[in-house]
Amino acid sequence: MQEIGILENLQKSLALKEGMLSYEMLGKSLSYNPYLPRVIPQIKDCVFVTPDEVLGKFLEENTRTDCVIVNFKGLYEIGAPSVFDLEVLGLLRRHASSLIVHQDLFISHYQLLESLVQGSDGVILDEELLKEDLKGMVEFAWRLGLSVFVETHKPDYTHLKDLGVLGVLEKVPHSQQNQKKNSFFKLNFKLI
Protein backbone atom coordinates (compact mmCIF):
# COMPACT_ATOMS: atom_id res chain seq x y z
CA MET A 1 0.00 0.00 0.00
CA GLN A 2 2.83 2.38 0.86
CA GLU A 3 4.49 1.61 -2.51
CA ILE A 4 1.38 2.87 -4.33
CA GLY A 5 1.55 6.16 -2.41
CA ILE A 6 5.25 6.51 -3.20
CA LEU A 7 4.66 5.98 -6.92
CA GLU A 8 1.76 8.46 -6.87
CA ASN A 9 4.00 11.04 -5.20
CA LEU A 10 6.68 10.36 -7.81
CA GLN A 11 4.22 10.85 -10.66
CA LYS A 12 2.86 14.08 -9.12
CA SER A 13 6.36 15.44 -8.70
CA LEU A 14 7.31 14.53 -12.25
CA ALA A 15 4.13 16.09 -13.71
CA LEU A 16 4.77 19.30 -11.76
CA LYS A 17 8.36 19.52 -12.99
CA GLU A 18 7.42 18.81 -16.60
CA GLY A 19 4.67 21.45 -16.33
CA MET A 20 7.20 24.05 -15.23
CA LEU A 21 9.97 23.11 -17.66
CA SER A 22 9.27 20.96 -20.68
CA TYR A 23 11.52 18.09 -21.73
CA GLU A 24 12.62 20.07 -24.79
CA MET A 25 13.55 23.15 -22.75
CA LEU A 26 15.37 21.03 -20.19
CA GLY A 27 17.36 19.48 -23.02
CA LYS A 28 18.19 22.89 -24.47
CA SER A 29 19.46 24.02 -21.06
CA LEU A 30 22.33 21.54 -21.45
CA SER A 31 24.08 24.01 -23.74
CA TYR A 32 24.43 26.32 -20.72
CA ASN A 33 25.37 23.59 -18.27
CA PRO A 34 28.87 24.07 -16.82
CA TYR A 35 28.98 20.53 -15.42
CA LEU A 36 29.68 17.76 -17.86
CA PRO A 37 29.56 14.29 -16.30
CA ARG A 38 32.95 13.03 -15.17
CA VAL A 39 34.05 9.48 -15.90
CA ILE A 40 33.84 7.14 -12.95
CA PRO A 41 36.92 4.93 -13.48
CA GLN A 42 36.83 2.95 -10.27
CA ILE A 43 35.12 3.61 -6.98
CA LYS A 44 37.12 2.84 -3.90
CA ASP A 45 34.82 4.23 -1.25
CA CYS A 46 31.48 5.99 -1.23
CA VAL A 47 29.50 7.97 1.25
CA PHE A 48 25.74 7.51 1.22
CA VAL A 49 23.73 10.64 2.17
CA THR A 50 20.21 11.98 1.96
CA PRO A 51 19.65 15.44 0.43
CA ASP A 52 19.34 16.99 3.91
CA GLU A 53 22.65 15.49 4.98
CA VAL A 54 24.56 17.05 2.09
CA LEU A 55 24.49 20.41 3.85
CA GLY A 56 24.27 19.19 7.43
CA LYS A 57 27.03 16.62 7.40
CA PHE A 58 28.91 16.30 4.16
CA LEU A 59 29.81 19.89 3.26
CA GLU A 60 30.13 21.25 6.81
CA GLU A 61 32.42 18.42 7.90
CA ASN A 62 34.38 18.70 4.64
CA THR A 63 34.29 14.94 4.20
CA ARG A 64 36.74 13.53 1.66
CA THR A 65 35.63 10.56 -0.39
CA ASP A 66 35.85 9.31 -3.97
CA CYS A 67 32.12 9.28 -4.50
CA VAL A 68 28.96 10.64 -2.90
CA ILE A 69 25.68 8.81 -3.43
CA VAL A 70 22.74 11.12 -2.80
CA ASN A 71 19.61 9.07 -2.15
CA PHE A 72 16.36 10.89 -2.96
CA LYS A 73 14.08 7.84 -2.58
CA GLY A 74 12.96 8.71 0.95
CA LEU A 75 11.48 12.03 -0.17
CA TYR A 76 8.56 10.26 -1.87
CA GLU A 77 7.45 8.65 1.41
CA ILE A 78 6.59 12.09 2.78
CA GLY A 79 4.75 13.42 -0.28
CA ALA A 80 5.54 14.90 -3.66
CA PRO A 81 9.03 16.42 -3.36
CA SER A 82 9.68 20.05 -4.17
CA VAL A 83 10.73 20.89 -7.71
CA PHE A 84 13.88 22.39 -6.20
CA ASP A 85 15.10 19.34 -4.26
CA LEU A 86 17.59 18.30 -6.94
CA GLU A 87 19.43 21.60 -6.63
CA VAL A 88 21.42 20.00 -3.83
CA LEU A 89 23.28 18.06 -6.56
CA GLY A 90 24.48 21.32 -8.12
CA LEU A 91 25.49 22.66 -4.73
CA LEU A 92 27.48 19.52 -4.07
CA ARG A 93 29.07 19.71 -7.51
CA ARG A 94 30.25 23.27 -6.87
CA HIS A 95 31.68 22.64 -3.40
CA ALA A 96 33.03 19.08 -3.42
CA SER A 97 35.47 17.30 -5.69
CA SER A 98 33.83 13.91 -5.13
CA LEU A 99 32.03 12.15 -7.95
CA ILE A 100 28.26 12.46 -7.55
CA VAL A 101 25.90 9.53 -8.08
CA HIS A 102 22.18 10.27 -7.96
CA GLN A 103 19.93 7.55 -6.53
CA ASP A 104 16.23 8.05 -7.13
CA LEU A 105 13.10 6.33 -8.36
CA PHE A 106 13.94 6.87 -12.02
CA ILE A 107 11.02 6.07 -14.34
CA SER A 108 11.48 8.54 -17.21
CA HIS A 109 14.09 10.04 -19.51
CA TYR A 110 13.12 13.46 -18.13
CA GLN A 111 14.50 12.51 -14.71
CA LEU A 112 17.81 11.33 -16.17
CA LEU A 113 18.18 14.55 -18.16
CA GLU A 114 17.32 16.58 -15.06
CA SER A 115 19.95 14.70 -13.05
CA LEU A 116 22.58 15.54 -15.67
CA VAL A 117 21.57 19.22 -15.75
CA GLN A 118 21.84 19.41 -11.95
CA GLY A 119 25.41 18.06 -11.98
CA SER A 120 25.46 14.32 -11.32
CA ASP A 121 28.13 12.09 -12.80
CA GLY A 122 26.12 8.89 -12.56
CA VAL A 123 22.78 7.40 -11.63
CA ILE A 124 21.53 4.30 -9.84
CA LEU A 125 18.58 2.68 -11.58
CA ASP A 126 16.29 0.23 -9.78
CA GLU A 127 15.98 -3.01 -11.75
CA GLU A 128 12.86 -4.10 -9.89
CA LEU A 129 11.07 -0.80 -10.54
CA LEU A 130 12.00 -0.50 -14.21
CA LYS A 131 11.71 -4.16 -15.25
CA GLU A 132 11.55 -4.22 -19.08
CA ASP A 133 12.24 -0.46 -19.30
CA LEU A 134 15.70 -0.91 -17.75
CA LYS A 135 17.48 -1.37 -21.09
CA GLY A 136 16.05 1.84 -22.55
CA MET A 137 16.88 3.84 -19.43
CA VAL A 138 20.45 2.49 -19.34
CA GLU A 139 20.95 3.33 -23.03
CA PHE A 140 19.58 6.86 -22.58
CA ALA A 141 21.75 7.50 -19.51
CA TRP A 142 24.83 6.36 -21.45
CA ARG A 143 23.93 8.65 -24.36
CA LEU A 144 23.83 11.54 -21.88
CA GLY A 145 27.29 10.58 -20.62
CA LEU A 146 26.13 9.41 -17.19
CA SER A 147 27.73 6.38 -15.55
CA VAL A 148 25.09 3.78 -14.80
CA PHE A 149 24.75 1.57 -11.75
CA VAL A 150 21.84 -0.76 -11.05
CA GLU A 151 20.25 -1.64 -7.74
CA THR A 152 19.33 -5.33 -7.81
CA HIS A 153 18.38 -8.39 -5.79
CA LYS A 154 19.76 -10.82 -8.35
CA PRO A 155 23.08 -12.55 -7.62
CA ASP A 156 23.93 -12.93 -11.34
CA TYR A 157 24.96 -9.67 -13.03
CA THR A 158 25.70 -11.01 -16.53
CA HIS A 159 22.60 -9.46 -18.07
CA LEU A 160 23.53 -6.08 -16.58
CA LYS A 161 27.10 -6.23 -17.85
CA ASP A 162 25.74 -6.85 -21.34
CA LEU A 163 23.73 -3.61 -21.04
CA GLY A 164 26.87 -1.63 -20.24
CA VAL A 165 26.17 -1.14 -16.54
CA LEU A 166 29.29 -0.06 -14.63
CA GLY A 167 28.40 -1.65 -11.30
CA VAL A 168 25.66 -2.83 -8.99
CA LEU A 169 24.33 -1.84 -5.62
CA GLU A 170 23.06 -4.95 -3.95
CA LYS A 171 19.78 -4.66 -2.09
CA VAL A 172 20.22 -6.07 1.38
CA PRO A 173 17.20 -6.97 3.54
CA HIS A 174 16.48 -4.36 6.21
CA SER A 175 18.85 -1.87 4.57
CA GLN A 176 16.16 0.83 4.77
CA GLN A 177 16.09 0.52 8.55
CA ASN A 178 19.87 0.79 8.70
CA GLN A 179 19.81 3.86 6.44
CA LYS A 180 17.30 5.62 8.66
CA LYS A 181 19.37 4.93 11.77
CA ASN A 182 22.68 5.97 10.25
CA SER A 183 22.59 7.00 6.63
CA PHE A 184 26.14 8.37 6.65
CA PHE A 185 28.16 5.21 6.14
CA LYS A 186 30.74 3.74 3.81
CA LEU A 187 29.38 1.70 0.94
CA ASN A 188 31.27 -0.41 -1.56
CA PHE A 189 29.92 -0.99 -5.03
CA LYS A 190 30.50 -4.20 -6.87
CA LEU A 191 31.94 -3.24 -10.21
CA ILE A 192 31.04 -5.65 -12.99
Predicted regions and their residues:
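Non-membrane alpha-helical structural segments and their capping/turn regions in soluble enzymes
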Residues: 83-86, 131, 135
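Catalytic cores of alpha/beta
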Residues: 107-119, 154-166, 182-192
